Amino acid sequence: MKHTLFAAALGLALTACSPVNHNHAPQTAAQSQSPSTMERNKANALAFYELAFNQHDLQRAVRQYVGKEYLQHNPMVADSGQAFIDTFAPFLKQNPQSRASVKRVIAEGDLVALHVHSQLSPEDKGEAVVDIFRFDNDGKIVEHWDVIQPVPKEKTASGRSMF
């Protein structure tokens, strides 16, 4: 237990000291997104998630909501909408009861973040997921980052849920 806490603390400390690397240019005032554009991007992120992870319609999700260029930062998924489909189609076939419940949606500029409870089945404790999507000017997803953490089987130290 001590080793786990030490490793977690060390990892957090090292991450906090790491330089930030932005793979896309920061927005200027002229490029900043209007509230209506951010609302559109939030709606598109939610619709993409519903199609892909609840209806399991990956083809339609990618066709409607992913741009021609799609950069992926998940180490298990290659760039492109087709790579997303190729990665998740076998997973969804193997886990037909999998569902994703979006708990929070946050937008800033061209970015939308979703805080999600992902489960393989209704009985599964699941995972807490934060997906961050970057949108182009047409409201298409062109870049993706994610952070995934298992939901503990026992009570959390704080007694609060992850959601």
Q: Model-found features: residue ranges?
A:
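Bacterial N-terminal signal peptides
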Residues: 7-15
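C-terminal and inter-domain tail/linker signature
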Residues: 17-163
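Positively charged n-region of N-terminal signal peptides that target proteins for export
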Residues: 1-4
